[in-house]
Design a protein with these regions (language model features):
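Conserved SAM/SAH-binding loop-helix junction
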Residues: 45
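Class I SAM-dependent methyltransferase SAM/SAH-binding core
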Residues: 48-92
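A short glycine-rich, Lys/Arg-flanked "PGG" loop and its adjoining helix->strand segment in the class I
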Residues: 119-131
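SAM-dependent methyltransferase
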Residues: 131, 136-199
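C-terminal lobe and adjacent flexible extensions of AdoMet/dcAdoMet transferase-like proteins
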Residues: 194-234
Length: 234
């Protein structure tokens, strides 16, 4: 069972305040012409709007319950014919089609615990791409201020939904816990610095084209958030 299974039904309310990335990834999908593979597709928060823009999406996720929600969302919004969902691992996705764009939104690569796992996921993305295809994803590396403000405190993220961040700065690991009245789960996020991502992407067969500091495409200036656009090398 995935650690996201218990919160599949509250995931969208929990992440309701995160909206800026949706338009960004829809624009990337439209520019690619599709189809698009989304790694860690979750509840379809990104995939369904991409499908509503007329682009076919092939999604993979380790949480069957999140995929169930994604199917419901696609059906309710009339785009189930454009959303193909698979249960599987980001490091070995059960997808055989080659596409012009692979995306991995909402910092999902940080679920990979070590550099070896992250590199395996990057190589899996590389294998899914057409020649000169692009891989677009976002991650973060926390600021000292963010760690100090949130460490070890339960905060109400949305009405009735609480989250707690426990930071292990030397180990560069965030243990994030989410709870509501009847569900609770915890999972780890493992961050890297910008230079470390550059090295991993190079080893994974990618050329970094752009790194932005947010989804409005502001230049990256050693900030917390990193949004990468990378081209597949042959």
């Amino acid at each position: 069972m995935s650690y996201y299974d218990p919160i599949a039904r509250i995931y969208d309310p929990w992440s309701r305040s995160v909206t800026e990335d949706v338009e960004f990834y829809v624009e990337a999908a439209l520019a690619s012409g599709g189809p698009v593979v989304e790694l860690a597709v979750g509840t379809g928060r990104i995939a369904v709007p991409i499908a509503e823009a007329g682009i076919r999406v092939i999604g993979v996720d380790l949480s069957q319950r999140m995929l169930d929600v994604a199917r419901e969302q696609a059906r309710e919004r009339g785009v189930e014919h454009l959303v193909e969902l698979h249960h599987g691992d980001l490091c070995d996705p059960p997808i055989h089609e080659r596409v012009p764009l692979v995306i991995c939104p909402f910092r999902s690569l940080l679920h990979m615990a070590g550099t070896g796992e992250k590199l395996a996921a990057l190589r899996a993305a590389h294998a899914l791409l057409e020649p000169d295809g692009r891989f677009v994803f976002d991650v973060f590396a926390p600021s000292r201020e963010d760690i100090e403000e949130t460490d070890g405190r339960w905060l109400e993220r949305e009405p009735g939904i609480f989250e707690r961040a426990d930071w292990d700065e030397p180990g560069r690991t965030l243990t994030l816990s989410v709870r509501s009245d009847d569900v609770v789960t915890s999972f780890g996020l493992h961050w890297l610095s910008r230079p470390e991502w550059d090295d991993l992407l190079d080893a994974g067969g990618f050329e970094v084209e752009e790194v932005w500091g947010w989804f409005d495409r502001r230049p990256f200036a050693d900030e917390e958030d990193m949004v990468f656009s990378c081209r597949r090398r042959a």
